[in-house]
Structures are given as structure tokens and as C-alpha cells.
Amino acid sequence: LSAVTRPRALPLLTPFTLHDGSVRHLWTTFSEDQIDLNFASPDVLIAMVDVLLHYLMEGANYIRLDAVGFMWKIPGTHCIHLEQTHQLIQLFRAITEAVAPGTVIITETNVPHKDNISYFGNGENEAQMVYQFSLPPLVLHAIHRQDVRTLSQWASSLELPSTKTTWFNFLASHDGIGLNPLRGILPESDILSLVEKLQQEG
């Protein structure tokens, strides 16, 4: 389990006491109040497809897949961005198109840009919208540097895999502004400088 990508410095496995008094350790990528689902279990997968179908039948226009990169677990791997995760999104997209054409799947993955855009798939088979997590810290960087060149160059370089995909642009979220999405866009020294400035300003 030491290879698993950790988005937070909290225990990966959390002990829970079952109704019979026994203790079971459950996978908690983010915190003890967010237990991960085991999509490798047919029962879990069917239950989640039922949930998806419920929302589609109720007329949902958007289906947001939260922290989608962590959906599948294989011990000995980083347990993020695995091929099985992409296959699940493709399954959800196929179901959505069959049951409620026009409903949009949006993925939320607070990761570096190159990993984030992988959730578009080939532009036809995964998410139609992807949260643009690099935008908030790049805007923050531009404000702190009083220089928009990096932001502007990055924005002009963006490409979508098809006309059926787009970005979900935002400037902050309930999680704040993460700096991990800057990796691969800014030098590490610029990221560390931004961290120092933010710490100084409280």
C-alpha cells in the first residue's frame, strides 16, 4: 500500500466496528467519513449503475463523478488513473447515452493537466466536461506575479479532443485552490515561490 497516491495526509485504511462487534479496516482515500467503493465487486457496480439510472430517469442534465481518478484499486500500484477507471467512465457514458442522450458527464480530478484531460478519453467515449483545475492556481500565479503571460500562453495552448467536449472553468472550490495541477506547466521553483507567498499572507 506504500505506492498508493495520497491526496491527504490521513490514514489510508480506517478501522470500523461492525454491528457484530468485529473490526474491519476499510479503504478511505480522503478521510474516515468518505469510504471508498469497491467497483470490482459486481454487487457494488450494479448498485452504482442503479443510482446512475435513478438520476437519469429523474432528468439529471449533468452527472458529476467526484475524485474519479481514485475509483479503482489494485494493490502495488498508485491506485490512480488506472485503466479500469477509464473503463468505468466509458460504461457510465454508454449507459447515459442509451438512457438519456444529452446528459453530460463531468469528471472532477484535482491532478496535473495531462492526467486531468485523460478523462475526455478519445473525445467520444468518456467525459464531455472536465474540471479545469489548472486555471485557478494559474490565475493566482498571475495575480501574485502581476504577469499574465504564463496564463495566457497556457490558455492559448489548450486543445480539446473533439467538438463534443469542453472545460468546466472555475476559480475556486470548497477544497480551495490546489497547486498540484500546476505541475508540468510551471517550474517547481515557481510553485514553491507561490507557496511561500501564500504562507506569508496567511
Question: Over which residues does each language-model region extend?
Answer:
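Alpha-amylase-like alpha-glycosidases and glucanotransferases acting on alpha-linked glucans and related
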Residues: 1-75, 86-202
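Short glycine-enriched, charge-decorated loop/helix-capping segments at active-site entrances
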Residues: 77-82
